[in-house]
Amino acid sequence: MNLHELKPNESAVKDKKRIGRGLGSGKGKTAGRGYKGQKSRSGDNRVAPYFEGGQTPLHMRVPKVGFRSPFKKEYSVINLSMLEKHFNDGDEITKETLLAKSLIKKGKPVKILGMGEVTKKFKVKVDAISSSAKQKIEAAGGSVEILEAAGE
């Protein structure tokens, strides 16, 4: 047996269905395209996935809601529980010390929130602080200084 003598079994290869070649062929007349419409025509008949046939599309029917203020201040927030965990009694807490311990990311002003308890004295110098956090720090004997923003 040689390579040129190999051939597939009798039933293994089916002839390709030739479309549009007479009514008796099973794929004659409309050639599987149905009747009329963009997809039955010749040429490029791809339709954009969001096109709904001329009906106002969904993304235009859904109402527009709200807006984003360009003046909104976004803070790097940190809770008292994290300060209690990462700093010792009498430590000064500033943006730089928080960055050094990887508790905040660079570029945003820092705000301290009041979740957690404080047992150590901290000297806190940050851009903003919640009233509950300020009360807890001062009750523990610490001090709070709010820094003024450069642009204000």
Curated annotation (Swiss-Prot):
Biased composition (Basic and acidic residues): 1-14
UniProt keyword terms in alphabetical order: Ribonucleoprotein, Ribosomal protein, RNA-binding, rRNA-binding
Gene Ontology terms, MF aspect: rRNA binding; structural constituent of ribosome
Listed Gly residues bias regions: 21-35
One GO-annotated biological process of the protein: translation
Region (Disordered): 1-55
Pfam families the UniProt entry points to: Ribosomal_L27A
Entry similarity comment: Belongs to the universal ribosomal protein uL15 family.
Function summary: Binds to the 23S rRNA.
Subunit description: Part of the 50S ribosomal subunit.
Protein name as catalogued: Large ribosomal subunit protein uL15
Organism this protein belongs to: Hydrogenobaculum sp. (strain Y04AAS1)
Organism lineage: Bacteria, Pseudomonadati, Aquificota, Aquificia, Aquificales
